[in-house]
Amino acid sequence: MRVGVQGCCHGILDNLYILAEKRKVDLLIIGGDFQALRNVSDYHGISMPPKFKRLGDFFNYYNGRNKAPILTIFVGGNHEASNYLDELPYGGWVAPNIYYMGRSSVINVGGLRIAGISGIYSAMDYKKGRYEGLPYNYKMLKSIYHTREFDVLSLKSLQKPIDIFLSHDWPRGIEQHGDVAKLLRHKPFFRNEVERNDLGSPALEELLVELKPRYWMAAHLHTKFTAVVHHNSQEDDGKLSCSSKDVTSSGFSMKGLNEPSQERLPVEKEQNDKSDEEGSNNEQEEKQDKKQSTNRDLCRKESCKKEPSLSSSDQVTKFLALDKCLPRRSYFEVVEIEPVEIPDSGAPYMQYDSEWLSVLRAMHPFQSHTIEQDPPLPSLEVVKTLKRKEEIWVDENLVKKDKLGIPRNFCQTAPPHSRDITENMQPSSYINPQTVAFEILIGLKERTVDSPPPVKNPNEIVL
């Protein structure tokens, strides 16, 4: 399968799809800062200085004027319409053919098992519950996109192999498995964090060591970086270790990776160059990006053969982080990954992952909507035990009844952008019908509450 990988999106979709179609990709994955703004009232849900807020391209995919020509999946970053994404904590369609992976999730796409987690790490909020709600105050606007231990623990309980792991943040220590000298020449202000072993997320470091996916894709730090992690050299302490044989100048050693494309495509002017400063050790880099001109795409292609199943002694993770959509930046790659199961021709078939559904059922009693995580989270071994019990329910009620297919049930909640909606209007809180349907499907909610009706499109012409 030809997988297009995009770094930070920042609301630029039209030109991205032009590029992805030219590259004939089967699937597009985006590493966050997607900015699914439906109308200008969603500005109140995004953490960003007002002068950099712009509606972007997404609203025309939400209102139906445009449709994504390629199946697109993404995780959330630290610049998102958090009020919209919060309607879909388990994931769901934000527009036709554009799928958000939720706070954390695993799905199967065309035979590839893809896991993902949204947000960035903050020690201050990591152990908190999900207490945020509209209208957001300044603190909530930050904390809502911070990764929680609940989601990391849920993912750590996975035991089946992962093909692709998608995150916004980098796993801490990953730079030691690539060309760290080159990274520091390009981003010298990372040096102190590298020396402190503080570049990236310690929570994602734990996930990388625990899950050992074939590929890990990320964004956030606005630079291209590749690395290869040999897990046989890792200590069993949840941390990345590094030996001299791990560090290479090339990271990915695939042919064609460093061959730039000669294509030129127009790109919208980028108005979201600066980070809203919050003390997070990685967000300050966004201040550096100010150049605006015609885009020269630096698309690379990685070709790889189908890899055999690896034993725990020789597992390898190939890491790829990409830049954001700006001229002369390496923000897009095409990676060819052969699925374990070859899908039928046509659009990749999407399914819920049975193991992940078991995890959701096992972890449901521990969901917290208060600032303190209440009830306390169980140990990883307890979660795995609970998951094994829930696997029986999932197998009997979903797998054997062929109910794992992800429905194409996108539904507008907030009204699409129009002149009647102004920037000073606070967004409303909505119960998304997709979330209700999903909770009913996996047995977290009884079918007793009617889903809210779809929002009528104000631009629709009634004959």
UniProtKB/Swiss-Prot annotation:
> Mainly localized where?
nucleus
Q: What is its EC number?
A: 3.1.4.-
Which regions are flagged for Basic and acidic residues bias? Answer: 276-289, 299-323
Instruction: Kindly give the SUPFAM superfamilies that the UniProt entry links to this protein.
Output: Metallo-dependent phosphatases
Q: Region Lariat recognition loop: start and end of each range?
A: 118-148
- Give binding positions for a divalent metal cation 1: 8, 10, 222
Region described as Disordered: 250-324
Xref: Pfam families: DBR1, Metallophos
Q: Which GO terms describe its molecular function?
A: metal ion binding; RNA lariat debranching enzyme activity
Bias regions of kind Polar residues — which residues? 256-267
How many cofactor units bind, and how?
Answer: Binds 2 divalent metal cations.
Q: Where in the cell is it found?
A: Nucleus; Cytoplasm
Activity regulation information from UniProt: Active in presence of diverse metals including Fe(2+), Zn(2+) and Mn(2+). Binds two metal cations in two adjacent alpha and beta metal-binding pockets.
Which UniProt keywords are present, listed alphabetically? Cytoplasm, Hydrolase, Iron, Manganese, Metal-binding, mRNA processing, Nucleus, Zinc
What cofactor(s) does the depicted protein rely on? Fe(2+); Zn(2+); Mn(2+)
Q: Where does a divalent metal cation 2 bind?
A: 33, 78, 168, 220
Gene Ontology CC, one term: cytoplasm
Specify the enzyme's EC class, one word: hydrolase
Q: Name one GO biological process term.
A: mRNA cis splicing, via spliceosome
Described function = Cleaves the 2'-5' phosphodiester linkage at the branch point of lariat intron pre-mRNAs after splicing and converts them into linear molecules that are subsequently degraded, thereby facilitating ribonucleotide turnover.
Q: Which family does it belong to?
A: Belongs to the lariat debranching enzyme family.
Q: What is this protein called?
A: Lariat debranching enzyme
Q: Which source organism? A: Schizosaccharomyces pombe (strain 972 / ATCC 24843)
Q: Which gene encodes it?
A: dbr1
